[in-house]
């Protein structure tokens, strides 16, 4: 393998990074040397000899990241501060995540909007943060760890003017208002993902035709794969119009479920961490603690993950 990006530009002062395994975004390769000059890749070539690193990969993009360790995307007060967002960005960068969406979960809608504004205001100090993913409060019947008392039906008035910086919205698909809500958001360039819901086939088709293009964390908080009944997981797997997130921490889904997703839908799987700030005051107030490999509510309900995309 010898992929020259531009061999004429190779310079003696370029940095050469060697790794025993190199993932180029599609294929996992063997020992590789990558030559970099001023942040630009000049060449990618097979390498013979000792390698400095075990694995080299492009930076990860995480579309669903609620926080990490003691830093929540919601912040510790009215919203996240610039210092908190910068700390979160630094922790993720150290773990290989170079781009990510700050994910805000179900809460009072005014508080969600305020927190979205806080992320946008603080983002200049966190270059990895691309914007916000609103995972709630417009969810369906499969709520998981979300606060049922704060869930709202899809609101077209909100969709007509979503908070600046909102790039992705998760919504339920069962409500009669869902297609109009989706159409309004999609028309404004917001990616709409179906999640925390158990739609019928008719509801699914209406929402996808309206502009929904993703599914949030496949297999989790949705109607499961079934050979006869309406199954959101199955519809997502077979519908080529849809990409989907997958929490491949082997707690949220099994290894066989991961294999099924990649086999059934090559090119449509988006790995997400769904990591949470399991050590922040908000999690502690809810009684969230690490048990059996993931953060959980006192009743055992999964409340996100404790891993970055690098594992």
Task: List each model region and its residues.
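A conserved glycine-rich beta-strand in the N-terminal activation segment of trypsin-fold
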Residues: 27-36
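Residue-level marker for buried hydrophobic side chains located in beta-strands
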Residues: 59-61, 132, 193, 271-272
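Divalent metal-dependent hydrolysis catalytic cores, especially in the metallo-beta-lactamase
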Residues: 66-68, 86-115, 127-141, 164-174, ...
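Charged helix-capping and loop-helix junction motifs
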Residues: 115-118, 151-156, 227-233
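Conserved phosphate-binding/catalytic loop of the ribokinase/pfkB sugar-kinase fold
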Residues: 140-164
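Active-site-adjacent beta->alpha loops and helix N-cap segments on the catalytic face
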Residues: 173-184, 201-202, 225-233
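Active-site-adjacent C-terminal substructures of enzyme catalytic domains
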Residues: 203-311
